[in-house]
Structure formats: C-alpha cells, structure tokens
C-alpha cells in the first residue's frame, strides 16, 4: 500500500484559496451588468417609454399649452401656427380678445372639470390674447376725446353679433406695436367656415387696410380688394353715403393725429 500524498492535496486546496482571494466582494458589488441593460426585455420598454414622454412633451408645448397673452407667443409660432379659442370681448370694430383653448373640445374645453366654463369679468385679466383682424380697417369709434366716424357703431355691433362668445381660429402673422396679434380669423357659421375680415368687407363694415407699413393679408389681398370694390358698387354699409362725405379710417387717423400734434 502506497503512502497518501498529503502534500499534493494541500497544494490543490492552496490553489483554490488563491483563486478565491483574487475576487473581492467589493469588486463583485461594483461591477456593472451591461447584459441586463441590453436585454430586449429591458431595452424595448425603456425606449418606448422615453419616446412617449418626449413626444408627449413636444405635443403639449407645441399644440396643447394654453397661451394667456400675446406676449407669451413664441416668435417661431408666427406664420406657422394658429390659435383656437373663444371670443370673450369685442372692444373695437376690427379687434377682439380671445381666450385660448388649445385642442378645443377634444382637449376637454367645455366639458372636462376645470375646463367646463371659461373665466368671466375680472377673472379674465391677463388671460386673453388681443387680436387685430388682418387686412381690414373698420371705422374708428370715439376714443381719447376724438369724435366717432360714421358707421363705427354699426361696424362694432356687426362684429359683436358675428363673433362674440363664439369659437374662432386665428392664423397669426405677427405682433404689432400695441401687442396685438395680427391674424386672419375664421369662424364657423352653421356648416361653413367664414373669413371674418372678408365678411366685414362684404357687408361694407370695413375697408381694405391702407397703411403702407405693417399691412398683413395672408394670401387674400386680391380677394379683399375685389370684395371691397363690389361693396362700394352696391353702396353697402359705410359706402351708402355721399362720396364727398366719405373719409377712410386711415385718413381719419392721419387727420386726427395731425390735429393733436398742433394742439401740443
């Protein structure tokens, strides 16, 4: 019977101990298991969730974020975006205040709790966008001690009846010197969408905008001028008086501004 080689066994055990000692618990805990992150069961849901969050954020900021006032409109929105909302006040015959309701009824405006009714009165302060209807100029009302133009009251009443408390869509061009948004405005009347500026010209409640600087028409200038010509021919609204007594809103503003400068 041969002698057992205890030295050989002890060498094997020593080798195992050396192998174990080369791995520390700290190294094992700090190691990153990249295989876990690249596993399709983890990677695909993570990518889908991230994409959904980014898309939802962009959608909200571009289309569903409510804009309280004209000064909050980003420059990049002009000529690229439209504003949908309810007309809360018509203070002049060619401009009004709009409460922006992005997304309309699909976004809960008019029925969802918190959006079922719009603010009223003093609660609307600093919450509406002042809109100037593009391409038209209505007779001037009495302001700052200046007398009203003929047909200014009729034009104001017409616009109030046409858009007050109605939902409209404004295709915005720029912000003017009075912090109003110049826009072509559309309103749904029965089953049809109507261009508010165009309808004012048809009724003889406004002229084509005559200022040399800052005029905005979108793609409708030729149409507007043709419609104004037809209203003149038919003596509608402000064209119903004698030609010699007519003064355009632009001429009125120029004359009254000159008179005010003389008095200074």
Curated annotation (Swiss-Prot):
Task: Give the E.C. number(s).
Answer: 3.1.-.-
Domain called TNase-like: residue spans: 81-241
Where does this protein have compositionally biased stretches of type Basic and acidic residues? 10-20
Keyword set includes Disulfide bond: no
MF terms per GO, please? Answer: endonuclease activity; metal ion binding
Annotated transmembrane regions = 42-60
**Which PROSITE patterns does the record match to this protein?**
TNASE_3 (PS50830)
SMART domains with a match to the protein in the record: SNc
Its chief place of residence is mitochondrion
Check the record and name the InterPro entries matching this protein.
Answer: SNase_OB-fold_sf (IPR035437), Staphylococal_nuclease_OB-fold (IPR016071)
- Which positions does UniProt annotate for Ca(2+) binding? 137
Report how it sits in the membrane.
Single-pass membrane protein
Gene3D superfamilies from the entry? 2.40.50.90
* Annotated segments matching region Disordered: 1-21
Recorded hits in Pfam families, A to Z, give:
SNase
Positions of the catalytic residues: 132, 140, 180
User: Which Gene Ontology cellular component annotation is one that this UniProt entry carries?
Assistant: membrane
Kindly list the places in or outside the cell where this protein is found, as annotated in its UniProt entry.
Answer: Mitochondrion; Membrane
Put simply, this protein is called Probable endonuclease lcl3
The organism's taxonomy opens as: Eukaryota, Fungi, Dikarya, Ascomycota, Pezizomycotina
Instruction: Quote the gene name from the UniProt entry.
Output: lcl3
């Amino acid at each position: 019977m041969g002698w057992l080689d205890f030295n050989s066994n002890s060498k094997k055990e020593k080798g195992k101990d050396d192998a174990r000692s080369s791995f520390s618990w700290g190294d094992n805990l700090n190691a990153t298991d990249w295989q876990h992150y690249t596993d399709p069961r983890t990677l695909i849901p993570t990518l889908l969730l991230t994409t959904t969050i980014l898309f939802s954020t962009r959608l909200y900021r571009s289309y569903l974020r409510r804009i309280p006032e004209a000064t909050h409109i980003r420059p990049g929105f002009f000529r690229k975006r439209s504003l949908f909302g309810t007309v809360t006040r018509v203070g002049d015959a060619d401009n009004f205040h709009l409460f922006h309701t992005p997304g309309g009824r699909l976004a809960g405006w008019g029925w969802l709790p918190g959006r079922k009714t719009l603010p009223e009165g003093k609660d609307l302060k600093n919450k509406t966008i002042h809109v100037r209807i593009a391409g038209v100029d209505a007779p001037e009302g009495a302001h700052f001690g200046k007398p009203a133009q003929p047909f200014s009251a009729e034009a104001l009443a017409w616009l109030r009846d046409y858009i007050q408390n109605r939902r409209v869509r404004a295709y915005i061009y720029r912000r003017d010197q009075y912090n109003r948004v110049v826009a072509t405005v559309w309103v749904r009347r029965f089953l049809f969408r109507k261009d508010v500026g165009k309808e004012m010209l048809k009724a003889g409640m406004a002229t084509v905008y005559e200022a040399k600087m800052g005029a905005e028409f979108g793609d409708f200038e030729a149409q507007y001028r043709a419609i104004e010509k037809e209203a003149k021919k038919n003596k509608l609204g402000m064209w119903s008086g004698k030609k010699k007594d007519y003064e355009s809103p632009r001429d009125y503003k120029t004359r009254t501004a000159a008179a005010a400068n003389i008095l200074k």
